[in-house]
Amino acid sequence: MKKILVLITLCLFASSPAMAETLQLLTWKGYAPKELVDKFEKETGITVEVTYSNNEEMIAKLRATRGAGFDLAQPSQDRISSVQAEFGLYQPVDYGKIDAALFIPSMLEAVKQNTLVAEKSYAVPFCWGTSGLVVNNAQAKGVTSWKALIDPQYKGRISYRLKRPVLIGLAFALDYDPFKHYGDEKGYAAMLEVLEAELIKAKPLVKNYWSNGDQLLESVRTGEVTVAEAWDNGAWKLHDENQAIDYVAPTEGALGWIDTFAIPAKAKNVEAAYKWINFIMQPENAALFTNAEKTPTASKDAGKFIDAAFQANFNRSFPQQVIDNIKWYPPVPANIEAMEGKVLDRIKAAN
């Protein structure tokens, strides 16, 4: 009988499939299109489980687990070095496992430098874009400045996220250079005091503080909001539906960001993470993402597969002088981010 049980057990193990591989991906909504997930799973046999998040939530989740629970995350490049230095949330990138030929060289190098901690780099680029304004030009003509977000003539039709872009954009509009103050805590605090007062005074002008892109798009689509802080890709989606709505890069400069791939410190399936990176950065796959999400990719040769509609949006919004005026986020020091968080909390709580 024992021999029979042993044989049955051996047969069961022999007939069972190998343990299925899983990639736990912590990312922004839209960054893992279903078509690409399905294609990756078919090609590799690796199941992709996606958790949607944003910069603040990614940091909070990874801090809570000390870098465990996920195999790959996608923070913005300016939000990596300070949290890595303080909390050790990520592991260094093994560039030997990255197909560097897939990336725009200057962007790959910039992210290497901007995520450098103790002579090791912690991310590679995925995509980039800007924060600026989405404007319904039929209802709010001539908007060109970040100051539109505190302009009484748009009372009840203004929206923005209570996050750092509105602080940074308004700072530039009020003739500060916030990035130059990163090393001057006292000067940065004085600037934040001015911004806090302006945004509290302007609270009665605000229709809502949006918290996700779909909420913003719907409020602009329905006409509830006519001027809002927004990402360029969301504005382009609305423009495709209604040409009166479009993206406006403020005259003080749109705010440029790069979202990345970073591998958490306690990732269980590191090899799957590198496979996903090299897969989604292949030109045709990267272009599929760009065409769907209207977000520029860091994939070097994706341009030949990007559709004409996206190219038209990009060319209309970003003539060369606008590109030259983009204010790119440098790595934000932890003390600066903490100061901003307290200011944003006070603005939210103010009556």
Q: Regions from the language model: what does each represent?
A:
Residues 74-217:
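Extracytoplasmic ligand-binding site segments that recognize negatively charged/polar headgroups
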Residues 79-82, 227-244:
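A ligand-binding cleft/hinge motif common to bilobed small-molecule-binding domains
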Residues 132-139, 171-173, 258-269, 288-292:
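A bilobed periplasmic-binding-protein/Venus flytrap-type ligand-binding module shared by bacterial periplasmic
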Residues 192-202, 241-265:
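Periplasmic-binding protein-like
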